[in-house]
């Protein structure tokens, strides 16, 4: 069971948006006492496909812009995302394992090296994704606030249903935070989001598969620790950000990436503006599968990453302090890049698909008369059309779904060097 209060949608269907309280959202919530079992998840939310999304672009969000006229998301249309003809592949059941050696091979089980320049005892492992599955899904429409969105809650419904129907996820192992829920613990406040992030990675073991999905406003703020080449941190905006502030990529990396052991998978989907490096993952790939960032040895230099070999001894939290001591005088450019590579790599298997690069906005879309995020729709639809895809094939498929109507270019990033020709499993 999830062990998280307020997980999911209160059982019997979603409730209407809450009446505005404290500016359209609930005041900061008191701390949880003991984690409790969530209510049963009985409502099955439908998911959708067929028409391509209409071009409804929202530009980079200015929190001071005027609130649009409220637009409800309405009842779900009758169309569905259809089930794929074959089940989603696993490491043991896939086209390659069944004799088609032209298909993408499953991930290897042996430890993998980061490459020249990294300590010999510092390795990562691909997850086999056959352990426990947990998911955290966040959708924020910002009801009654400036910059209100229409499709983010629908994104969460669609994604949660897709995970349950096509992967090994269970409702009781999901936490869903949306701003249409009456339970204060299920509101996407900053406190609830941070607590849920800790819940997601708690007690994760090798070959577990964790899933994080965020649909809402994203933006940029001035970088304060010198780890961003462009001088800006990427941020997400909780529903109560005007009172308690945003959440930075540094904080999300510290909570959800740094504690993970080798062989734990975290798959993250960000459907927000300026989200290309929202988890601060140092390896970034193009649609051709080419590493867009220089490799570890070129930037960091041989021996520079010696301190992070403490990962292999289990000292996951002492790593950053050691490395930051080496780089404390670095300010930008190549030095900032080297610091990012030194502190943001991980022996875990963290993969992120984002709706846009750091300098791009993302789009709201309309699909079968339902508002939804373009990236969330494209991810589901691409896998529905072809479950047996490599990472680079999936990235290309997502871009193919978007390119006819949108300028945004989704991006693939990873915590370790990624063989993009391997089978995508989750």
UniProtKB/Swiss-Prot annotation:
The active site is at 217, 273. GO terms for biological process: apoptotic process; proteolysis. GO terms for molecular function: cysteine-type endopeptidase activity. It is an enzyme of class 3 (hydrolase). Gene3D superfamilies: 3.40.50.12660. Residues 1-14 have a biased composition (Gly residues). It comes from the Eukaryota. Belongs to the peptidase C14B family. PANTHER family: METACASPASE-1, METACASPASE-4. This is Metacaspase-1B.
């Amino acid at each position: 069971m999830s062990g998280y209060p307020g997980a999911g949608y209160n059982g019997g269907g979603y409730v209407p948006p809450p009446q505005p309280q404290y500016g359209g959202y609930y005041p900061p919530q008191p701390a949880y006492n003991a984690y409790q079992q969530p209510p049963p998840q009985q409502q099955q939310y439908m998911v959708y496909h067929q028409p391509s999304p209409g071009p409804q672009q929202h530009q980079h969000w200015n929190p001071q812009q005027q609130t649009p006229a409220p637009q409800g998301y309405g009842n779900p249309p009758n169309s569905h995302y259809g089930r794929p003809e074959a089940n989603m592949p696993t490491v043991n059941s896939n086209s390659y394992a069944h004799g088609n050696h032209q298909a993408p091979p499953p991930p290897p089980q042996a430890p993998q090296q980061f490459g020249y320049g990294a300590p010999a005892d510092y390795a990562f492992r691909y997850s086999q994704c056959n352990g426990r599955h947990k998911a955290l899904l966040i959708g924020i429409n910002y009801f009654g606030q400036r910059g209100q969105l229409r499709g983010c809650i629908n994104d969460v419904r669609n994604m949660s249903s897709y995970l349950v129907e096509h992967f090994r996820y269970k409702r009781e192992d999901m936490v869903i935070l949306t701003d249409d829920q009456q339970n204060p613990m299920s509101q996407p406040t900053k406190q609830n989001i941070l607590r849920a992030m800790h819940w997601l990675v708690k007690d994760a073991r090798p070959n577990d598969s964790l899933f994080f999905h965020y649909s809402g406003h994203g933006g940029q703020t001035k970088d304060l620790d010198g780890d961003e080449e462009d001088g800006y941190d990427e941020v997400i905006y909780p529903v109560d950000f005007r009172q308690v502030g945003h959440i930075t990529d540094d904080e999300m990396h510290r909570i959800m990436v740094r504690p993970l052991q080798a062989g734990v998978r975290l798959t993250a989907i960000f459907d927000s503006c300026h989200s290309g490096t929202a988890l601060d993952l140092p390896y970034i790939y193009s649609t051709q599968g080419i590493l867009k960032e220089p490799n570890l040895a070129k930037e960091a230099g041989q021996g520079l990453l010696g301190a992070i070999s403490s990962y292999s001894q289990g000292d996951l939290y002492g790593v950053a302090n050691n490395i930051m001591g080496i780089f404390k005088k670095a300010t930008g450019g190549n030095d900032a890049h080297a610091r990012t590579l030194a502190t943001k790599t991980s022996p875990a298997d963290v993969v992120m698909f984002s709706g846009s690069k750091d300098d791009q906005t993302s789009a709201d879309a309309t699909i079968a008369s339902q508002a939804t995020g373009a990236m969330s729709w494209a991810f589901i639809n691409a896998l529905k059309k072809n479950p047996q895809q490599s990472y680079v094939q999936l990235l290309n498929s997502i871009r193919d779904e978007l390119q006819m109507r949108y300028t945004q270019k989704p991006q693939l990033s990873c915590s370790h060097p990624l063989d993009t020709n391997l089978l995508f499993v989750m």
